[in-house]
Amino acid sequence: KDLNKILSLNIPKHDKAGDNHYGLISALHKSIRGSDPDAGLFWLARALNAGEDPFYIFRRLLRISIEDVGLANPESQRLVLDSWNTYEKLGSPEGDIALAMSVILLSLSPKSNAVYLADKESQKFAKKYSSEQPPKHILNSPTKLMGRFGYGAGYEYDHCLLYTSPSPRDSRV
């Protein structure tokens, strides 16, 4: 009789490093990425009820703010950090509202992964050309000897030029 009662309980499934842990966090992340605040709040509540560390969730939300929201709402990073700070000061259950606020904010924010993609591409490019020296025109020339070797030759101080477009003036890197 007692065993049947225990077996009928709806105990949240969770493991700190296994499929349930990553499944809940993935569902939260993808709900936010999909701009669905209701689903995001549901998966947040599921994760918290299952015993997920709120600070792990905040780390994930911070990651979402820079990878998925990015430059479409750059303030989201600061707002997630402010919510994290609020949670640290209040603790649970009051601080849980700060978590929920971050989930809603990120869900409703426009999304851009341009920085994430640009960073990945620049890392590949830097690895491919890791032995290339910087072009001499952008090297510092603190001595006359370095100037004679071409360091800094042809460098144009951007603040002294009229700004015309976000594209480079020429093909020099």
Where do the language-model regions lie?
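C-terminal helical "lid" of AAA+/P-loop NTPase domains
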Residues: 1, 42-46
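Conserved C-terminal helix/linker of AAA+ ATPases
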Residues: 1-10, 57-59
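Conserved helicase/translocase motor-coupling segment
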Residues: 14, 29-30
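Inter-lobe coupling/hinge segments of SF2-like helicase ATPases
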Residues: 14-22
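Amphipathic alpha-helical repeat elements characteristic of tetratricopeptide repeat
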Residues: 21-22, 38, 77
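C-terminal accessory/connector segments of nucleic-acid motor ATPases
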Residues: 37, 42, 54-58
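Terminal-proximal interaction/regulatory segments of ATP-powered molecular machines
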Residues: 50-56, 65-142, 147, 151
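Conserved small/polar residues in nucleotide/adenosyl-binding loops
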Residues: 163-170
